[in-house]
From Swiss-Prot:
Subcellular location: Cytoplasm
EC number of this enzyme: 2.1.1.-
Record's signal peptide: none
Alphabetical list of InterPro entries matching this protein: Ribosomal_L11_MeTrfase_PrmA, Ribosomal_PrmA_MeTrfase, SAM-dependent_MTases_sf
Protein name, per record: Ribosomal protein L11 methyltransferase
Organism expressing this protein natively: Edwardsiella ictaluri (strain 93-146)
Positions in coiled-coil regions: none
Enzyme class: transferase
One GO molecular-function entry: protein-lysine N-methyltransferase activity
Domain of life per record: Bacteria
Family indicated by similarity: Belongs to the methyltransferase superfamily. PrmA family.
A Pfam family: PrmA
GO annotation terms (biological process): methylation
């Protein structure tokens, strides 16, 4: 069955009230989308994350009289007569099947593969992490995750302890364990991420070597041979005093979630304690690595 979609640009502060207005006028679903594709944190449980410039997208049954919906929305205080919007008809698809068909095993570096469970493993003798996309956490498709996976693949992790700061799906911690690390520690602000990491670790047979913590529960004396943090430039700068103390003397640090234009400001926050390598870039994103002095 086809559907009608309306897209309205809004500020983050008005988006939720527009969502309510769309639902009151017959929308079967409403979603929020960043107008500029800016990276953001995962929201805390119970929070709705909104950008400064947000597209509010309502989906209606194909038989909906949209002129009547528009007339009602023009009375909304955030819109008014003649508000800008885009309406289009979209065809119904088996979205789940299409999505599954488009998700393939991916190789990172020389040894490491990330494989969905419904695909045949391309290299059975390689290091294979089985990971199905689920919650909005890393699966390897984003350039920042790919940069971190490639970095881990190039390290000798045998017997090492690795901290994955902002672990999301646990993909980096699990990859480190499969690459030979003796122990991994995942830290995330979101309980859903902790659960996703736990589930993925069990699927990959490494749950006994993965410790998971919310920040409030993590031990005070945490340290590791390798620390990887794939979050965002702002938090990486703000949390530099904390993250910078996690690698042991001579330990390795890998940072990503950083736009290339933000690299220098992040480097500046870590340069005092770390001998930094040249910045690695991929599709306007970058990775910063270094050794704890």
């Amino acid at each position: 069955m086809p559907w009608i979609q309306i897209k309205i640009n809004s500020t983050g502060g008005q988006a939720e009230t527009l969502s309510d207005a769309l639902m009151e006028n017959g929308a079967v679903s409403v979603t929020f989308q960043d107008s500029h594709d800016n990276p953001v944190f995962e929201p805390l449980p119970g929070e709705t994350l909104l950008w400064g410039d947000t597209d509010v997208i309502g989906l209606f049954d194909a038989e909906t009289e949209m002129s009547a919906v528009i007339a009602e929305l023009e009375n909304h205080p955030a819109l008014g007569a003649g508000f800008r919007h885009k309406i289009e008809q979209i065809e119904d698809k088996d979205w789940e099947r299409e999505w599954m068909d488009n998700f393939h095993p991916m190789q990172f570096g020389h040894r490491l593969w990330i494989c969905p469970s419904w695909r045949e493993i391309p290299e059975p003798d390689a290091v294979n992490v089985m990971l199905d996309p689920g919650l909005a956490f890393g699966t390897g498709t984003h350039p920042t995750t790919a940069l971190c996976l490639q970095w881990l693949d190039g390290l000798d992790l045998a017997g090492k302890t690795v901290i994955d700061f902002g672990c999301g799906s646990g993909i980096l911690a699990i990859a480190a364990l499969k690459l030979g690390a003796a122990r991994a520690i995942g830290i995330d602000i979101d309980p859903q991420a902790i659960q996703a990491s736990r589930d993925n670790a069990e699927r990959n047979g490494v749950s006994g070597r993965l410790e998971l913590y919310l920040p409030k529960d993590q031990p005070a004396d945490l340290s590791a041979d390798v620390v990887v943090a794939n979050i965002l430039a702002g938090p990486l700068r703000e949390l530099a005093p904390l993250i910078g103390c996690l690698p042991r003397q001579g330990g390795l640090l890998g940072l990503s979630g950083i736009l290339a234009s933000q690299a220098e400001s992040v480097c500046e926050a870590y340069r005092e304690k770390f001998a930094l390598d040249p910045v690695a870039e991929r599709e306007e994103w970058c990775r910063i690595t270094g050794v704890h002095r």
